[in-house]
């Protein structure tokens, strides 16, 4: 059997100020993300305008981070490390950094194999993110049949990794599990996407349930962050929970288990918005770093890649057209 090549797909993030507008326009004009059914041209004009208006608001947030968003650099480094371990090409892809796309597409087109496995760096599948990535490659390289690992949030090795990551964090700080309330935070999604067949929330709950089986002495909540735009989103929101939670546990610890790399949602939103809110209410509030920082992350991902079955692109997205605005 031909040795496969791998496509390591991530969200992308601005590396510096010049990337920010490009990043926001690419993100918000993706109809898989915004879910509108506006005519294509109108959609692009409207959300380009919205993206440009958001730049002055978001720019100071990114500038306050030490090295902007580390997600780009984490993905590049991970691709090189995986390539050495798997002894195969591993091509990185940054969905919302269009200036990097041609390099990825060229690398795919010049491969000496047509056996390509896609690795989306998202534990839980949603048509708005993983689905968007899959459709991108169906459009731009239809001649290359990529099969995908759809999700791994409930994979026993991922569950064990998150469990060890949390326990290591507690041990380093001398905190007992019975003294903790954990807020397991994932990115939010509009409820209408779920009602139209997106499996995201179901997978998040399954993953949360599998992980918290290992934490019976703590108080545990699943919550959803980063709401953008109108309409009802999955609840409880992380912000609401931080504002309203009533627990006798002295330590409230946010666990961003839906995010592989730290980026704006963890380094700014959790760190600068949610933790101060909890502290103002008298709790010791902490954030566990994203799983990328774990020394066991790479070996766990290698096992997941080797042991999980893949799904062809057409099968993966066939029921995902209801909410995306795709015609």
UniProtKB/Swiss-Prot annotation:
Keywords: Cytoplasm, Heme biosynthesis, Iron, Lyase, Metal-binding, Porphyrin biosynthesis
PROSITE patterns, per the entry: FERROCHELATASE (PS00534)
Enzyme class: lyase
InterPro entries the UniProt entry points to: Ferrochelatase, Ferrochelatase_AS, Ferrochelatase_C, Ferrochelatase_N
One Pfam family here: Ferrochelatase
EC number: 4.98.1.1
SUPFAM superfamilies xrefs: Chelatase (SSF53800)
List of residues binding Fe cation: 187, 265
GO process annotations (BP): heme biosynthetic process
Catalytic activity: heme b + 2 H(+) = protoporphyrin IX + Fe(2+)
Pathway in which this enzyme or protein is active: Porphyrin-containing compound metabolism; protoheme biosynthesis; protoheme from protoporphyrin-IX: step 1/1
Record GO terms (molecular function): ferrochelatase activity; metal ion binding
Subcellular localization: Cytoplasm
GO CC annotations on file: cytoplasm
Family indicated by similarity: Belongs to the ferrochelatase family.
NCBIfam families per record: hemH
Function: Catalyzes the ferrous insertion into protoporphyrin IX.
Alphabetical list of PANTHER family matching this protein: FERROCHELATASE, FERROCHELATASE, MITOCHONDRIAL
Name under which the protein is recorded: Ferrochelatase
Organism annotation: Chlamydia pneumoniae
